[in-house]
Curated annotation (Swiss-Prot):
Pfam families: LHC. It comes from the Bacteria. Antenna complexes are light-harvesting systems, which transfer the excitation energy to the reaction centers. It is a single-pass type II membrane protein. GO terms for biological process: photosynthesis, light reaction. This is Light-harvesting protein B-880 beta chain. Belongs to the antenna complex beta subunit family. Its main location: membrane. Residues 1-20 are cytoplasmic. GO terms for cellular component: plasma membrane; plasma membrane light-harvesting complex. It comes from Rhodoblastus acidophilus. One of its GO terms (molecular function) is bacteriochlorophyll binding. Disulfide bonds: none annotated. InterPro entries: Antenna_a/b, Antenna_beta_CS, Antenna_beta_dom_sf, LHB-1/5, Light-harvesting_complex.
């Protein structure tokens, strides 16, 4: 049987490389999502003001 140090079978260097890519991709996704929400809010706010939707 092979001696594996991890359940996934990837080396520590491969895991760190994947983690760095995952974190950068997730960060980019969050930035794009926040920007989209800000633009949508500027276009059409989804919480009514003090006078309602009028």
């Amino acid at each position: 049987a092979e001696d594996r140090s991890s359940l996934s079978g990837v080396s520590d260097a491969e895991a760190k490389e994947f983690h760095a890519l995952f974190v950068s991709s997730f960060t980019a996704f969050i930035v794009i999502a926040v920007l989209a929400h800000v633009l949508a809010w500027a276009w059409r706010p989804w919480i009514p003001g003090p006078k309602g939707w009028a």
